[in-house]
Amino acid sequence: MNKKVFSTLFLAVFSVTLGVGLVVPLLPVYAYELGATGLYIGFIFGAFSLSRTLFLPYFGRLSDLKGRKPFLTTGLLAYFLVSIAYVLSKNVSFFILIRFVQGVASAMILPVAQAYVGEITPKHKEGFMMGLFNVSLYAGLSIGPLVGGMVKDSFGIHSSFLSMGLVSLIGFLLCLIFLPPRAHERFIKPDKPPLRYRILARNRYIGALFMFRFAYTACIGLVWAFLPLFAHAQFKLSSSAIGVLVMLGVLTSGLLQTPMGFLADRFNKRALIAIGGLVTAGAVFSFIHVQGFWGLFVANILFGVGGGISVPAVMAMTVIIGRRTESMGSVMAILTMGHSLGMFAGPILAGIMTDAFQLSLAFMGGTVVMVICVAVALLLTSGFQAWAEV
């Protein structure tokens, strides 16, 4: 295990997720001030997910062929330039273009960094190392919105954008200086090119993890998009109270990543995925029946626990598959595509159900999707341990 490389990747990903957390909650307000309607605000968020999803397969496979460092440094530098572009944006169309470019940059960073960590992770420590690495994501997403709001209130929204640029620049410099040159970064040297996506797509274990990741992040998108509306409409909660609730789930899941990753290396990974998935489904279902702030408080903790149990096991299995297929970047890209598609589809499908029926049915729909995907994932991953040890 190369501690310098791991620490550099950890800090770089923390910096970029912190930067995202600094500005994303502020984007709807800024877009509205530029004259965006509700539809264009949807385009602003959709452009990011669309470009990220489109470019993930390309950069994932290319990083298997060309190395990780060039993509990490390019993506982080692009984030810095995007932050400057936010400040200079004067109309909605340019704002949408910026978000599209940011999605492309995002496709170069997280899956490539996760693939790099997967490559340097010792056997039988996949859960612990990926769980520890995931702390960088959850920490950035937990701290970012709080700091971003404080910076905006004190210095204005442009300062929040520039803060994103600063932390992205720090991440870029860390990777540029401390990651080894491309020629020396491959700690596992495959003796053949990475598998093509059409071959990886036929791997039932990848399909199972993709399906679970899609369902789980669709539930995240549902909760993040509609919990504020539900909490305000049903219980008249303040914006600060709603912010605490949303952050609570992220924080809980983040705190569980490392200990549950440790368990994933020692116990049945499929069982942990099933338990975490069912806890997540139960939490989403409970939102319909809770009463008041404290009911939502408990439901959000439960939602975070579900992710905290399941995600390290999912990532551990992903690393094992990537190592076995000698296509770590491509496999990570596929799983991240599931994440992106879930975050894109979850709020949209929930919105359709809310408009056609009522808000509570959106949470019911998320519950059903999660339970079905847990069952299918369990079926498809049968025999995984024997396959992994061949």
Where are these regions (language model features)?
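Juxtamembrane intracellular "pre-TM" segments in multi-pass secondary transporters
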Residues: 1-2, 180-210
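Short amphipathic helix-loop junctions that connect adjacent transmembrane helices
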Residues: 26-38, 225-240
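Cytoplasmic helix-loop-helix junction between adjacent transmembrane helices
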Residues: 98-137
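Paired small-residue
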Residues: 93-101, 294-302
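Residue-level signature of mid-helix packing/kink "hotspots" within the transmembrane helices
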Residues: 49-57, 141-142, 250-258, 343-344
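Intracellular juxtamembrane helix-capping segments at the cytosolic ends
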Residues: 108-121, 309-323
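Structural signature of the two symmetry-related core transmembrane helices
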Residues: 70-84, 165, 271-285
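Helix-breaking motifs and short loop linkers at transmembrane-helix boundaries and internal kinks
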Residues: 35, 67, 88-93, 236, ...
